């Protein structure tokens, strides 16, 4: 038997079929083993798994079918002609997650540092095309050093092909990027075009220009993790949707996410068996949410009480914490939940919260996931920084996303729903299919105190006791325009419900809306605020 060496040369070839099969087995063994045991040990020493180990954790056992395993680059110069390892540093193929097809590519950092060259890129292009054609999710396991400099502009063109396919696949198949090493420059742009980004603390970083360039240009001293680590992108930039302490947990959560998503935009999310009664009453909700609108509470406790078995997956958990975006199930059906978080900034909408929720609403709409919105919002965050930062433009993103969504949309007002923020948070007037409210609701243009100061300004100023007059006017305004049934009497709320019945009301409403069909005007595409 003769096996080709890294340079692609051999001393002889087998002449019979059995010999050729034996030769193939040897070549495959070489491709599966990777460059060397030393390279594997170096990868493990960094607390990182190899590409094949990662794929094994992601996919169902024994389901991976590799393609282009024997691919080699054809570059010359800089000694590349003498080093032509199989796979060219990226492993591509498909398998299953809980029995459903998923396509995957994984950079092999042991080969050229996972850097992208021409052959490497075309392998990725092919698997992306296959995923789009098959209508199945695509997961990228990223651990690469950017473009392969030795191959010059061909490597850059390879990135262009990836970006083009990311965009083509957007809203068609779920795209999930898992960052498992340093990813700089072009390697960071592809994940930004996908639906979800996962990162692992201490081992994964994303940035356009690294610490050395930052130091040279600006004089700032910063580490890789300080510049683009998992915590930075999960808490500050919003680039990362999920951050975990180790690869095993990270990949397990990727599997969990995939199980909640449809295969493509033409299918509905999978339905799971549910033992949690659809008509389960939740008396505890009255204790979780204070009737006093000025008292904070944790909205996640409300979500836990409403959804199946208290189980949900929060997206962007640590970024823009004044709003919650989560995937959960109601009677086995996947739903997207958008909820104000009174525990942080009183649940106001600001620039980051608007962007976070808008992106989530668009994702849900693209993949046929009904949206449940839980409102307790006192308005938009005031301030010079917000206005100069473009709160009008950013807030309009959320407004546009809701107005453009054709999936079933149900809104529930728990307490405050004030002003423009109330309208933006999927009010009936912008197309919510059903709007419910608890008897603790306060729906108004603004809070009673502010409204009284505007409407009764002269009476308050002329009163012998302005504070007493103000208190009286506030009480009068609340009684006249903010009582719990004011909006329902005018048809702006479909029903005022007992909080304990919320779960059953939501489930019954979603069942009714399951076959909802809505058409948008014919157009090439909208022009949403950016």
Each predicted region: which residue ranges?
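Ligand-binding clefts of soluble mixed alpha/beta catalytic domains
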Residues: 1-530
């Amino acid at each position: 038997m003769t096996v080709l060496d890294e340079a692609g040369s051999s001393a002889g070839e087998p002449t019979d079929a059995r010999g050729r099969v034996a030769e193939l087995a040897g070549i495959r063994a070489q491709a599966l083993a990777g460059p060397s045991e030393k390279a594997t040990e170096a990868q493990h020493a960094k607390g990182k798994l190899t590409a094949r180990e990662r794929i094994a954790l992601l996919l169902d056992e024994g389901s991976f079918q590799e393609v282009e395993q024997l691919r080699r680059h054809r570059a010359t110069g800089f000694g590349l002609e003498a080093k032509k390892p199989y796979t060219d540093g990226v492993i591509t193929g498909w398998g299953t997650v809980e029995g459903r097809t998923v396509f995957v590519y994984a950079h092999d950092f042991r080969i050229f540092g996972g850097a992208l060259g021409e052959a490497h890129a075309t392998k990725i292009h092919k698997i992306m095309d296959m995923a789009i054609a098959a209508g199945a999710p695509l997961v990228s396991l990223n651990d690469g050093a950017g473009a392969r400099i030795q191959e010059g502009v061909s490597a850059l063109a390879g990135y262009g092909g990836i970006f083009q396919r990311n965009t083509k696949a957007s809203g068609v198949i779920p795209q999930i990027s898992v960052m498992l090493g340093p990813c700089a420059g072009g390697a960071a742009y592809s994940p930004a075009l996908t639906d979800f980004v996962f990162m692992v603390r201490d081992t994964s970083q994303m940035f356009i220009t690294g610490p050395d360039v930052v130091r040279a240009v600006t004089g700032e001293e910063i580490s890789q993790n300080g510049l683009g680590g998992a915590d930075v992108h999960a808490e500050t930039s919003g680039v990362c949707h999920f951050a975990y302490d180790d690869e095993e947990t990270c990949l397990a959560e990727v599997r969990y996410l995939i199980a909640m998503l449809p295969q493509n935009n033409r299918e509905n999310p999978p339905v799971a068996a549910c033992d949690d009664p659809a008509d389960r009453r939740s008396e505890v909700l009255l204790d979780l949410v204070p009737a006093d609108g000025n008292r904070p509470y944790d909205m996640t406790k409300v979500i836990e009480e409403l959804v199946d078995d208290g189980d949900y997956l929060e997206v962007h958990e640590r970024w823009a914490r004044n709003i919650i975006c989560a995937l959960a199930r109601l009677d086995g059906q996947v739903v997207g939940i958008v909820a104000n978080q009174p525990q942080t900034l009183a649940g106001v909408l600001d620039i980051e919260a608007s962007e976070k929720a808008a992106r989530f609403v668009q994702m849900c709409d693209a993949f046929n996931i009904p949206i449940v919105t839980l409102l307790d919002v006192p308005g938009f965050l005031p301030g010079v920084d917000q206005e100069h930062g473009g709160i009008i433009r950013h807030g309009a993103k959320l407004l546009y996303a809701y107005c453009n969504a054709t999936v079933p949309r149900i809104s529930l007002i728990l307490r405050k729903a004030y002003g423009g923020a109330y309208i933006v948070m999927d009010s009936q007037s912008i197309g919510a299919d059903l709007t419910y409210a608890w008897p603790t609701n306060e729906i108004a243009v603004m809070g009673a105190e502010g409204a009284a100061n505007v409407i009764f300004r002269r009476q308050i100023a002329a009163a012998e006791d302005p504070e007493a007059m103000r208190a009286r006017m506030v009480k009068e305004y609340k009684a006249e325009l903010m009582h719990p049934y004011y909006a329902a009497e005018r048809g702006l709320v479909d029903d005022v419900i007992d909080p304990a019945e919320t779960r059953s009301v939501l489930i019954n409403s979603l069942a009714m809306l399951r076959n909802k069909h809505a058409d948008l005007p014919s157009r090439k595409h909208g022009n949403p605020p950016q």
